[in-house]
Regions:
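Interfacial segments of alpha-helical transmembrane regions
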Residues: 1-14, 66-75
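Membrane-helix boundary connector in multi-pass membrane proteins
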Residues: 63-70, 83-104
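Hydrophobic alpha-helical membrane segments
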Residues: 44-47, 69-89, 108-113
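Membrane-water interface at the C-terminal end of transmembrane alpha helices
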Residues: 3-10, 108-132
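Interfacial helix-start motif at the membrane-water boundary
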Residues: 38-54
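Non-cytosolic membrane-interface motifs at loop->transmembrane helix junctions
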Residues: 33-43, 94-107
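Hydrophobic transmembrane helix segments
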Residues: 10-42
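Juxtamembrane helix-break-helix junctions at the cytosolic face
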Residues: 53-69, 125
Length: 132
């Protein structure tokens, strides 16, 4: 599997994990401990869509414009996956259900893997897009 395809696969895995976490958030919003009351299911879905657009933009830039610019945006996209850890700033791990913790941790782990791969590609310094 070439690097471009590997990057796309990792992005799709992270996007799936992130979507799963966000859907769980939206469906069980009032069960998440100490979430502000102004956070709504609709807002959760819109947030995920905005984050996904960043990922799509990053991959488009990577493939069509500039590998380094694309990888920077993909890195930002991956960093946003660490936002799930914010749940633990407002309530301890023990206050969350197993499903909540699993959805948070899987999102963070997949974000970390994507971020690491994007950083590796940056270090390798590829100059132009390769065909998929």
């Amino acid at each position: 599997m070439n690097r471009t395809r590997s990057l796309l696969v990792l992005m799709l895995i992270y996007a799936s994990a992130s979507l799963t976490h966000f859907i769980h958030n939206a469906l069980h919003i009032r069960a998440y401990p100490n979430l502000p009351s102004w956070i709504t299911p609709f807002g959760v879905y819109i947030s995920w869509c905005a984050i996904a657009v960043i990922g799509v933009l990053g991959f488009w830039l990577y493939r069509r414009v500039s590998r380094s610019a694309g990888l920077l945006i993909i890195g930002l996209y991956a960093l946003l996956g660490f936002g799930g850890l914010d749940h633990y700033l407002i309530a301890p791990v023990s206050a969350h259900t197993v499903a909540m913790n699993v959805s948070i941790i899987v999102e963070v782990v997949t974000a970390f893997v994507l971020l690491s791969f994007a950083a590796l590609l940056m270090l390798l310094g590829e100059k132009r897009a390769a065909p998929m």
